[in-house]
A protein has these predicted regions:
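Conserved beta-strand segments of alpha/beta enzyme cores
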Residues: 11-14, 94, 122
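Short acidic/polar active-site loop segments enriched in Thr and Asp
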Residues: 11, 66, 212
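ATP-dependent adenylation/pyrophosphate-handling site
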Residues: 1-6, 14-17, 99, 202
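Conserved small/polar residues in nucleotide/adenosyl-binding loops
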Residues: 2-11, 219-226
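A conserved beta-strand->alpha-helix junction
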Residues: 10-33, 127-133
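Active-site adenylate/phosphate-handling loop in enzymes that bind or generate adenylated species
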Residues: 26-111, 115-119, 165-175, 179-182, ...
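AMP-forming adenylation/ATP pyrophosphatase catalytic core
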Residues: 90, 94-102, 109-119, 127-131, ...
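Aromatic-residue hotspot detector
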Residues: 4, 22, 82, 160-161
């Protein structure tokens, strides 16, 4: 996230599709290891960061770069996930973290929204629905707004993206048959698919029936609590 830089010089832009690698090398091993946080959170954000860091290092080596810059804030766990992964793979590379720079002008989500508005950058959400979201094939997490107040109920009508509020889900259930080989799913309802497509199929089926909603408070490594 380089929004807010006085000047952003772009030489090359890489858009890499690592979905299948994410599924095979991260999601499947984590599921097989029963890697769950607080008995219900399936680590959708946590498990994605090492793969991103790995690709960043590969591209940095390809380009002959001497540093990697990330847009994680100075409060959350992502800065730790990215930097430990990068340092494990490429200890010689310098890490640049603008959010921890005292001269960085954007210190909150509202600052970013104001910056975009002032510079004519369209945002696909309104200020009153500006949840902080992290989405990948495995999950979507939401933070911010009423979620930060334990006394308030989540506004599922505005919040949910991948699933349906339970009260709006069908009354009738739906049967799903899955086949596994060596602990890895290979088909859904008799249709053979690769893991990434199986996850997409199950997201659609589960979302239709209001499956997959959890609420969890977790502790940042820097002792911040987030709901």
């Amino acid at each position: 996230s380089l929004v807010g830089s006085e000047m952003c010089i772009r030489d090359r832009l890489y858009i890499e599709d690592i979905v299948d690698e994410f599924c095979d090398d991260y999601i499947v091993p984590c599921v097989q290891a029963n890697a769950v946080y607080e008995n219900k959170y399936l680590l959708g954000t946590s498990m994605a960061r090492p793969g991103i860091a790995k690709k960043l290092v590969e591209i940095a080596r390809k380009e002959g770069a001497t540093a990697i810059c990330h847009g994680a804030t100075g409060k959350g766990n992502d800065q730790i996930r990215f930097e430990l992964s990068i340092k494990a793979l490429a200890p010689d590379l310098k890490i640049i973290a603008p959010w921890r720079d005292s001269n960085w002008k954007l210190q909150s989500r509202q600052d970013e929204i104001d910056f975009c508005t002032a510079h004519g950058i369209h945002l696909p959400f309104s200020v009153d629905s500006s949840y902080s979201r992290d989405r990948n094939l495995w999950h979507i997490s939401h933070e911010g707004l009423e979620l930060e107040d334990p006394s308030l109920e989540p506004n599922y009508e505005h919040l949910l993206v991948l699933t349906t509020p339970p009260e709006k889900a069908p009354d009738e259930g739906e049967y799903v048959t899955m086949t596994f080989e060596k602990g890895v799913p290979v088909s859904v309802n008799g249709k053979k698919m690769k893991v990434s497509d199986i996850i997409r199929e199950l997201n659609t089926l589960g979302g239709k029936h209001g499956i997959g909603i959890i609420a969890v408070s977790y502790t940042h490594l820097r002792a911040h609590e987030t709901k």
